[in-house]
Amino acid sequence: MAKNITVNNVIVQYVFLERVNPVSNKFTFDCLIPQDHPQVAEVMAACSAEWLVVAAGAAETSAQSMGTNWTLPNDTGHIHPDVAPMLDPNLQYLRFRGVQDAAVAPEKATKIYANMQQEDGTIGVGEVTNRSIIGDGTIANVNLNAFGYQASGQKGVKFYGQWIQIVNLVESDYAGAGAPPAVIDNGYVAPAAMFAP
């Protein structure tokens, strides 16, 4: 299970990836922070501010469209069923996410490779697929063509909550395994060399 992942210098307890719509090839990265985390307000403010920058002119202004919402720990419709039992049943969790919608250019969909927990519970290296849990939090290779519309030049390919700065994906249950941590500089993609296969 990916634990203790640093995003915007905030320790995030769990991260998982879900393909929301296999037709449009839309992926969602979900991160959960307990409501009593000292930086919850900071995360919400940063997400809201960057959403307004990334999606300037967008009609949607709800908390969900800004990339955050509050989720109960037993809400397996929004929380991975393998993650839900690990959460504190007495807390709500701030769920924030980045969505890569490759409907405009599905052939350029971001592919993420990581040491991940397979369906049988084993840890293996491969492409992170639908509803997989990122096992050790390391990203080995990302196709940058669709990693946010700044890189692709297509507004149809974007991240909701592009502010998420995955500074260091470290201190996981499988620390030291797999590729070195990936870095996304100031919320945008780092040089492609940093994501060499």
Predicted regions and their residues:
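A beta-strand/beta-hairpin structural motif
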Residues: 98-128
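OB-fold ssDNA-binding interfaces and closely related basic DNA-contact patches used
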Residues: 1-102
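OB-fold/S1-family single-stranded nucleic acid-binding modules
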Residues: 151-172
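Beta-strand elements of well-folded, non-transmembrane domains
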Residues: 35, 146-148, 168
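Acidic, gly/ser/pro-rich intrinsically disordered tails
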Residues: 1-5, 170-197
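A short, structural micro-pattern
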Residues: 23-25, 88-90, 138, 153, ...
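Exposed beta-sheet edge/beta-hairpin loop segments within beta-rich domains
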Residues: 116-140, 147-157
